[in-house]
UniProtKB/Swiss-Prot annotation:
<protein>
    <recommendedName>
        <fullName>Large ribosomal subunit protein bL28</fullName>
    </recommendedName>
</protein>
<dbReference type="Pfam" id="PF00830">
    <property type="entry name" value="Ribosomal_L28"/>
</dbReference>
<feature type="region of interest" description="Disordered">
    <location>
        <begin position="1"/>
        <end position="24"/>
    </location>
</feature>
<dbReference type="InterPro" id="IPR034704">
    <property type="entry name" value="Ribosomal_bL28/bL31-like_sf"/>
</dbReference>
<keyword id="KW-0689">Ribosomal protein</keyword>
<dbReference type="InterPro" id="IPR026569">
    <property type="entry name" value="Ribosomal_bL28"/>
</dbReference>
<dbReference type="GO" id="GO:0003735">
    <property type="term" value="F:structural constituent of ribosome"/>
</dbReference>
<dbReference type="GO" id="GO:0005840">
    <property type="term" value="C:ribosome"/>
</dbReference>
<dbReference type="InterPro" id="IPR050096">
    <property type="entry name" value="Bacterial_rp_bL28"/>
</dbReference>
<dbReference type="GO" id="GO:0006412">
    <property type="term" value="P:translation"/>
</dbReference>
<dbReference type="GO" id="GO:1990904">
    <property type="term" value="C:ribonucleoprotein complex"/>
</dbReference>
<dbReference type="InterPro" id="IPR001383">
    <property type="entry name" value="Ribosomal_bL28_bact-type"/>
</dbReference>
<dbReference type="InterPro" id="IPR037147">
    <property type="entry name" value="Ribosomal_bL28_sf"/>
</dbReference>
<feature type="compositionally biased region" description="Polar residues">
    <location>
        <begin position="11"/>
        <end position="24"/>
    </location>
</feature>
<keyword id="KW-0687">Ribonucleoprotein</keyword>
<comment type="similarity">
    <text>Belongs to the bacterial ribosomal protein bL28 family.</text>
</comment>
């Protein structure tokens, strides 16, 4: 699986950069994902978790 939050499913979103002349070029807004060790089915596993999920206590580190 790609870089996506294991808990909430948050991932990068896309949009456009706009110049003063309103020309557009594609860009990405990356989610604040951190690689952490958590318990998955009783075993420690390294997964990508969003900083928001870590701060809100939805997941606990091992």
């Amino acid at each position: 699986m790609g870089k996506q939050c294991f808990v909430t499913g948050r991932k990068a979103s896309t949009g456009n950069n706009r110049s003063h002349a309103l020309n557009s070029s594609k860009r990405r807004w990356n989610a604040n994902l951190q690689k952490v060790r958590i318990l998955v089915d009783g075993k420690p596993k390294k997964v990508w978790v969003s900083a928001r999920a870590l701060k809100s206590g939805k997941v606990t580190r091992v």
